[in-house]
């Protein structure tokens, strides 16, 4: 590098006013490769200015630049011992001689061995070349960018170091930040305000899908999703936090809506006054439907008696006529007494307001297809039929829709002789009362 700098310094030194009298004027009139043809002692003297021309030519990339540069370096080592001779007039005459024999570059190499011994003394003994060495450093920065790059790099290095520290701070905040360039783009504002992250639709779909399965993300899964979606772990963590808050807010809004608008239907069955036939049906275990299409043996009288359309079932009972005095609907023989205790459905199934109360819904008779079906949840202990299962399918049939064609209907428990009910069809006046009763009790 010292030789190169010395060589470049001579090249730049050729343009200074010190050599303007001979070197600069001489360089203007000469071709780049002409000086190598001169072989005499005069040629040694004017080789130095010729090298000054060749230094820019070497930058141009000519094919023989390496050989020429070596020749120039070796010839340059000799001439500095004769700096005063540079200003003598014998230098201008050689140009006409040097112009014709330009195509002889390989001849200079044999000549250099003679001046080479003189190479070591010149730098120490000659002041002008030293000044040339000292001067060209600022000019070399302008002409040779390869040499000035380290110095320029040193000047910029503090700023570069600072920016690297900034990027380190940012990357420490978010471990992998390639895709988040939007967050880090303002270096000065990164600490004060974080830019809003814009997620793509594909990223949002994946995040929503993951949130559907897991509201809280474990770290391995978060790292996996960060690599999958080109996001940082911090971004995914913050997105899940925001999404959980949004979900909580939505649930609160839904809870408010259901509490305000949805409690009226949930409270409707609670008060006993609003319990109609439909509510009593819902309270049953199997919710027996009303089937008028399956006619019992004496279907016509009950159809005339129960001629109300199905639309009138949900209506509350107070709209009906007041109940008649207690009627003997059926008599059950006591276990030990011969007396026939009366069973009053009005006193049992109705409260003061004429509708079924909630405690008696399970025990109230239900009309199915022209027959009474008595659920056995509460009526079993009343009639002494404690051995029957408490289901609607095992309910007692008072209307005669079963396989028994005769008027007498025995209780379904064959092992118990007590609950033998008298024929309802044999007593015609009581049958008329039975036909009227369902209007008042079973609506």
Swiss-Prot record:
* Compositional bias (Low complexity): 301-310
Keywords tagged on the record:
Developmental protein, DNA-binding, Homeobox, Nucleus, Transcription, Transcription regulation
Instruction: Give GO MF terms, alphabetically.
Output: DNA binding; DNA-binding transcription factor activity; DNA-binding transcription factor activity, RNA polymerase II-specific; HMG box domain binding
Record has DNA-binding as a keyword: yes
TM helices/strands, residue ranges: none
Gene3D superfamilies xref list: Homeodomain-like
Polar residues bias (residue ranges): 132-151, 166-178, 188-197, 257-267
Q: Tell me which InterPro entries the record gives.
A: DUF4074, HD, HD_metazoa, Homeobox_Antennapedia_CS, Homeobox_CS, Homeodomain-like_sf
* PROSITE patterns, sorted: ANTENNAPEDIA, HOMEOBOX_1, HOMEOBOX_2
Pfam families in UniProt:
DUF4074, Homeodomain
Superkingdom of this entry's organism?
Eukaryota
Q: What does this protein do?
A: Sequence-specific transcription factor which is part of a developmental regulatory system that provides cells with specific positional identities on the anterior-posterior axis. Binds 5' to its own homeobox.
The molecule here is called: Homeobox protein Hox-A3
């Amino acid at each position: 590098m010292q030789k190169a700098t010395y060589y470049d310094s001579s090249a730049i030194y050729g343009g200074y006013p010190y050599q303007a009298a001979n070197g600069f004027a001489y360089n203007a009139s000469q071709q780049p490769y002409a000086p190598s043809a001169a072989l005499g002692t005069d040629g040694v003297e004017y080789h130095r200015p010729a090298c000054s021309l060749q230094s820019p030519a070497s930058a141009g990339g000519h094919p023989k630049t390496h050989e020429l540069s070596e020749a120039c370096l070796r010839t340059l080592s000799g001439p500095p011992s004769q700096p005063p001779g540079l200003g003598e007039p014998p230098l201008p005459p050689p140009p006409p001689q040097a112009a014709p024999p330009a195509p002889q570059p390989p001849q200079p190499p044999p000549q250099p061995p003679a001046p080479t011994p003189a190479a070591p003394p010149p730098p120490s003994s000659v002041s002008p070349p030293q000044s040339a060495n000292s001067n060209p450093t600022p000019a070399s920065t302008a002409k040779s960018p390869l040499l000035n790059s380290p110095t320029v790099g040193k000047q910029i290095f503090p700023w570069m170091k600072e920016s690297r520290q900034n990027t380190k701070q940012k990357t420490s905040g978010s471990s992998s930040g390639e895709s988040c360039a939007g967050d880090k783009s303002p270096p000065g504002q990164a600490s004060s305000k974080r830019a809003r992250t814009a997620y793509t639709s594909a990223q949002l779909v994946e995040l929503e899908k993951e949130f559907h399965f897991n509201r809280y993300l474990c770290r391995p899964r978060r790292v996996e999703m960060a690599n999958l979606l080109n996001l940082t772990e911090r971004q995914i963590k913050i997105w899940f936090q925001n999404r959980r808050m949004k979900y909580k807010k939505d649930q609160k809004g839904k809870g408010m809506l259901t509490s305000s608008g949805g409690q009226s239907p949930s409270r409707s069955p609670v008060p006993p006054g609003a319990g109609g036939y439909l509510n009593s049906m819902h309270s049953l275990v199997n919710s027996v439907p009303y089937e008028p299409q399956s006619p019992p043996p004496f279907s016509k009288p009950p159809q005339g008696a129960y001629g109300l359309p199905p639309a009138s079932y949900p209506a509350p009972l107070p709209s009906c006529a007041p109940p008649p005095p207690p009627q003997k609907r059926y008599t059950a023989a006591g276990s030990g007494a011969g007396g026939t205790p009366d069973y009053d459905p009005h006193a049992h199934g109705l409260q003061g307001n004429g509708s079924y109360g909630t405690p008696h819904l399970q025990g109230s008779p239900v009309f199915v297809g022209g027959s009474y079906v008595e659920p056995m949840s509460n009526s079993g202990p009343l009639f002494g039929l404690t051995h029957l299962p408490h289901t609607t399918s095992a309910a007692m049939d008072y209307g005669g829709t079963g396989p028994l064609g005769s008027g007498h209907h025995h209780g379904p428990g064959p092992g118990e002789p007590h609950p033998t009910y008298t024929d309802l069809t044999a007593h015609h006046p009581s049958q008329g009362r039975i036909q009227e009763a369902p209007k008042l009790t079973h609506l």
